[in-house]
């Protein structure tokens, strides 16, 4: 069974979609204790609350289990157009997104990586603050790149995505989200089918 880790997991709405498609959640990460307790109850896990910003330290990333997929729903309040008409401070939101991407980059490029795909969603306005690609240098992974015989200016992740409407996929509600991610060359066809909507 393919495994996944859910960052900013909340009670597990994003996890549920993957679970219903046959993937196994092995960890949920969230800084809000009620969310983690709910996620644990929903998926039979025993996680404790953790701040995603802890993973700015690469040693914390290296402690994480390896998984086939990583998903994440960074907080959208910074990017929501309903927050100060879209003029709210974006610095924390960008920092959380880039920390998530840093985790993904390390898991993607580490030796003997098993990561096959990653997937991130946020409100449509976040698209304006997410680059189409990030180098190792962009993600403060210069030392990691050098240690793994990679050029610090090489592209670590491609983040080009699209704004999708849940109503187009069977939901009775109009809900637009910016979706980005990658499926990696070692991905098998069954997982690849689920990511066709990104291209």
What positions do the PLM features span?
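Class I SAM-dependent methyltransferase "Motif I" SAM/SAH-binding loop
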Residues: 7-11
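Short, conserved SAM-binding/catalytic segment
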Residues: 37-48
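The conserved SAM/SAH-binding core of class I Rossmann-like methyltransferase domains
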Residues: 28-29
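Conserved SAM/SAH-binding beta-strand->alpha-helix loop
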Residues: 32-33
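A short, Lys/Arg-enriched amphipathic alpha-helix followed by its capping loop at the start of a domain
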Residues: 17-24, 42
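Extreme N-terminal starter segment of soluble prokaryotic enzymes
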Residues: 1-4
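Class I S-adenosyl-L-methionine
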Residues: 58-67, 76-199
């Amino acid at each position: 069974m393919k495994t996944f880790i859910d960052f900013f997991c909340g009670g597990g709405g994003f996890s549920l979609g993957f679970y219903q498609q046959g993937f196994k959640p092995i960890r949920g990460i969230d800084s809000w204790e009620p969310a983690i307790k709910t996620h644990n109850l929903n998926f039979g896990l025993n996680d404790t609350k953790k701040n995603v910003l802890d993973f700015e330290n690469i040693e914390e990333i290296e402690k994480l289990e390896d998984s086939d997929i990583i998903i994440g729903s960074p907080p959208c309040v910074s990017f929501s157009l309903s927050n100060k008409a879209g003029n709210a401070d974006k610095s924390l939101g960008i920092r959380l997104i880039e920390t998530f991407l840093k985790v993904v980059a390390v898991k993607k490029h580490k030796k003997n990586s098993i990561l096959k795909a990653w997937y991130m969603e946020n409100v449509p306005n976040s698209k304006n603050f997410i680059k189409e690609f990030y180098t190792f240098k962009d993600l403060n992974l210069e030392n990691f790149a050098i240690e793994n015989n990679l050029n610090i200016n090489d592209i670590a992740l491609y983040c080009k995505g699209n704004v999708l409407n849940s109503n187009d996929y069977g939901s009775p509600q109009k809900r637009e989200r910016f979706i980005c991610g990658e499926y990696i060359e070692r991905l098998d066809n069954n997982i690849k089918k689920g990511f066709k909507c990104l291209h």
